[in-house]
């Protein structure tokens, strides 16, 4: 199976990964060590909804890997993969959020936030910590605490910033049937 990307999709991955890195450098600390409030997941969620799961996956994988390599901690693959999976999961449900059709009402906001909260809970509360325990032999209590705090922090930041980004994006789209021939 051959996957072909359009120029628009390639640009979305490049810009999305770059934004992931730049915004990811802004760290708002939490009481849990090595865990901070991250705002880049709002942009990743936006791109996942607009361009779909593969673009969301690539933005998270590439962006997080570059960010980790720049900050000097080394590549932490379980969390890099979790970032990609967050974009994948959100993108899989994009058809339920109607921003492409210039619609992002309360129903869409509710659906988007339900999807992203469940995705955050899954990838940060379960998959990333489980990977840390299995692959890196990290202490389960520590990594699950980090994962739960990261999931909550990311869920709140995406609920606020992601919703605002999607509202702004929906406002730029032409509503189906709104154009009439004179």
Curated annotation (Swiss-Prot):
UniProt keyword annotation of Ubl conjugation present: no
Membrane-crossing residue ranges in chain numbering: 10-30, 46-66, 73-93, 109-129, 148-168
Any Pfam family the entry gives: ECF-ribofla_trS
Matching Gene3D superfamilies: 1.10.1760.20
Keywords from the UniProt entry: Cell membrane, Membrane, Transmembrane, Transmembrane helix
GO CC, any one term: plasma membrane
Domain of life of the native organism: Bacteria
InterPro entries for the chain: ECF_substrate-spec-like (IPR009825), UPF0397 (IPR022914)
Location(s) in or outside the cell: Cell membrane
Similarity comment text for this entry: Belongs to the UPF0397 family.
Protein name, UniProt field: UPF0397 protein SPG_0438
Provenance organism: Streptococcus pneumoniae serotype 19F (strain G54)
């Amino acid at each position: 199976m051959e996957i072909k990307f359009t120029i628009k999709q390639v640009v979305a991955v490049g810009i999305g990964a770059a934004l992931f890195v730049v915004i990811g450098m802004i760290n708002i600390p939490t009481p849990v060590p090595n865990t901070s409030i991250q705002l880049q997941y709002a942009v990743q969620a936006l791109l996942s909804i607009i361009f779909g799961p593969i673009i969301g996956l690539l933005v998270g994988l590439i962006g997080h890997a570059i960010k980790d390599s720049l900050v000097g901690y080394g590549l932490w693959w379980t969390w890099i993969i979790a970032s990609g999976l967050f974009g994948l999961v959100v993108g899989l449900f994009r058809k339920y959020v109607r921003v492409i059709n210039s619609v992002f009402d309360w129903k869409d906001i509710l659906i988007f936030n339900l999807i992203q909260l469940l995705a955050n809970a899954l990838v940060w509360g379960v998959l990333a910590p489980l990977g840390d325990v299995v692959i890196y032999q990290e202490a389960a209590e520590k990594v699950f605490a980090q994962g739960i705090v990261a999931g909550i922090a990311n869920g709140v930041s995406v609920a606020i910033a992601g919703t605002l980004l999607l509202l702004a994006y929906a406002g730029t789209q032409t509503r189906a049937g709104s154009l009439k021939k004179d």
